[in-house]
């Protein structure tokens, strides 16, 4: 009976994670679909890859996932440098944010975007999109150095 209770609790927690993850991915998909429609409407982008549903999912999904990993790696690397060099003026304040934004944008463009031949988005549009994401990050997470209250 004890194991049945643990199994039931595990299934409930797992179902909550699966349902919330599915809702998040659905909203992310609708948001990216809306963004792509806006970019196409204003002739700022062209998405020429149009195969089957799963092929499109893998092609465009890998573009998004690689972009996210690029952002994640640069953010963590810059935070690591900030912790190792706390007195350096380049790793403080607005200069730090501008360096992080510039490195992220350039690496995304030259490592990820340039290899996807069916996605045609101008560099300045990518700069604008990533810039809006960084501004939202600073608005909603203004002091990102200690979000989890960890004292190290």
Curated annotation (Swiss-Prot):
Transmembrane stretches, start-end: 11-31, 57-77, 94-114, 116-136
UniProt keyword Transmembrane, yes or no: yes
Localization of this protein: Cell membrane
A single GO cellular-component term on record: plasma membrane
Database matches in InterPro entries: SepA
Membrane topology according to the record: Multi-pass membrane protein
Keywords: Cell membrane, Membrane, Transmembrane, Transmembrane helix, Transport
Highest taxon, organism lineage: Bacteria
Keyword Transmembrane: yes
Pfam families cross-referenced by the UniProt entry: SepA
Protein function: Involved in multidrug efflux.
Family to which the UniProt record says this protein belongs: Belongs to the multidrug resistance efflux pump SepA family.
Protein name, entry field: Multidrug resistance efflux pump SepA
Underlying gene: sepA
